């Protein structure tokens, strides 16, 4: 009885915290809308929403293609094609022009942001609100235990960058500006984080039951389905996303903070701070978000399904797995190789067993140092001109949608697999297909044990959980190869 009461109190506590966060985002979005409306931009926004305009900016440049053309283009983006095909002078010139155009676009975006800031300087009350948000993030991390290892430095970064006159986020000598340029804005820190994740990850459950990779892949439904949510959100006055921003928001559905930072840094750096905070917030809220969806989509009988113990996995299998994973990625999806490559490297030095000093350093000291710097760099982007906008509220809503659909995708795939499998799998482990390791696996185990205290699903759920890490990295590679290359 006391346990049930504590669970209810925890759920009520999480609900209150989530409500507070949404209300703050709502206030900030209206403040941003009011500021933009007073500057006379409402007319342009209305024009953008006209019936003749496209739903997502940038999609008007995407020409319809046939199925055969689609697969032909996919084939040209594989590592196999690039290794055996000698590029023509026209292709080299086109690639060079594309890179130059991207650099010009970045410079124009930076110049436009500086011009907007000069035209509409940050007001004192806006800095005060951002300071309050920074302290709120620290409070949630310390008192409520919401991802404290990351949220504390993010909160302090938010506080430090918004101190009037301190200049910690100003270039070229501000400390937070240096941290951001050194590792956050150029993907260096997220790569190191993935190396650390690899050193801490055990792929044994996935190797023992490779079918679980399907559940990790199905959970990416939330990532791609969110693109439709972005299209719908663009009908709301004051919200206006382009295709790159849509992809950066959608990756929140993978429940992977480093990947969200990596993709947003590549495609939508102006939204990185909100996307990172949203991603880590929903990762912390896994015990609240997932169980209702799990119970809604499964029956009591399905939740009580017991699975056979996993077979032992040899050291040779564990050592070869990261190498095989890297080779497949190189051959089929090179844009995902940076993330997968660092994950494979970290896991290989752990499993090979002859460089324990390296693996322990990557897993502990290096991971901790980079986490601090990465989080401070993300916090340095929590400035009024980037946060106080209706798009910030949209990110919070769409992130929750992505996470919920990803959970549902894994559950539904598990139920579909049971139609063809002799040895049934418990659909609850499908919810662990999101890459919140190991939180999602623990939630699946907890919900299963609530139905049957003797039903231990943790190791089974770790299979789709680590597959979700790989799946999210692959989804990131698809987005970057499509819109960021």
Question: Predicted regions span which residues?
Answer:
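Low-complexity, proline/glycine-enriched hydrophobic segments characteristic of transmembrane helices
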Residues: 16, 30-123, 238
């Amino acid at each position: 009885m006391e346990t049930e009461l504590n669970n209810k109190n925890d759920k009520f506590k999480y609900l209150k915290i989530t409500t507070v966060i949404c209300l703050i985002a709502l206030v900030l979005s209206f403040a941003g809308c009011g500021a933009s409306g007073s500057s006379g931009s409402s007319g342009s926004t209305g024009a953008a929403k006209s019936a003749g305009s496209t739903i997502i900016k940038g999609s008007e440049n995407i020409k319809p293609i046939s199925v055969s053309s689609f697969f032909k283009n996919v084939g040209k983006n594989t590592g196999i094609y690039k290794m055996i095909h000698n590029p023509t002078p026209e292709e080299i010139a086109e690639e060079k022009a594309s890179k130059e155009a991207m650099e010009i676009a970045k410079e124009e975006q930076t110049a436009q942001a500086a011009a907007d800031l000069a035209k509409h300087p940050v007001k004192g009350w806006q800095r005060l609100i951002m300071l309050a948000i920074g302290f709120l993030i620290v409070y949630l991390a310390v008192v409520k235990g919401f991802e404290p290892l990351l949220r504390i430095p993010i909160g302090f970064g938010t506080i430090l960058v918004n101190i009037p006159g301190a200049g910690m986020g100003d270039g070229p000598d501000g400390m937070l500006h240096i941290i951001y340029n050194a590792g956050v804005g150029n993907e260096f820190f997220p790569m190191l984080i993935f190396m650390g994740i690899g050193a801490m990850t055990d792929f044994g459950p996935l190797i023992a039951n490779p079918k679980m990779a399907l559940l990790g892949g199905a959970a990416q439904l939330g990532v791609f389905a969110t693109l439709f949510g972005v299209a719908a959100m663009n009908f709301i006055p004051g919200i206006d996303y382009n295709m790159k921003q849509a992809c950066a928001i959608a990756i929140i559905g993978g429940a992977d903070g480093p990947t969200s930072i990596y993709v947003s840094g590549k495609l939508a750096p102006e939204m990185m701070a909100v996307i990172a905070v949203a991603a880590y917030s929903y990762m912390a809220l896994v015990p609240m978000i997932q169980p209702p969806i799990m119970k809604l989509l499964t029956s009591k009988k399905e939740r009580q399904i017991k699975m056979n113990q996993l077979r032992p996995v040899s050291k040779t299998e564990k050592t070869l797995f990261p190498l095989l994973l890297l080779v497949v990625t190189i051959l089929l999806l090179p844009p995902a190789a940076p993330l997968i490559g660092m994950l494979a490297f970290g896991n290989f030095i752990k499993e090979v067993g002859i460089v324990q000093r390296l693996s322990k350093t990557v897993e502990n000291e290096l991971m901790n140092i980079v986490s601090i710097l990465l989080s401070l760099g993300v916090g340095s982007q929590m400035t009024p001109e980037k946060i106080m906008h209706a798009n910030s509220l949209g990110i919070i809503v769409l992130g929750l949608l992505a996470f919920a659909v990803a959970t549902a995708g894994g559950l539904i795939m598990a139920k579909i697999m049971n139609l063809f499998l002799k040895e049934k799998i418990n659909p609850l482990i499908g919810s662990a297909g999101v890459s919140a390791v190991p939180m999602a696996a623990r939630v699946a185990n907890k919900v299963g044990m609530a139905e049957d205290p003797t039903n231990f699903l943790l190791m089974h759920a770790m299979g789709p959980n680590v597959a979700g890490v790989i799946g999210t990295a692959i989804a990131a590679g698809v987005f970057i190869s499509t819109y960021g290359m």
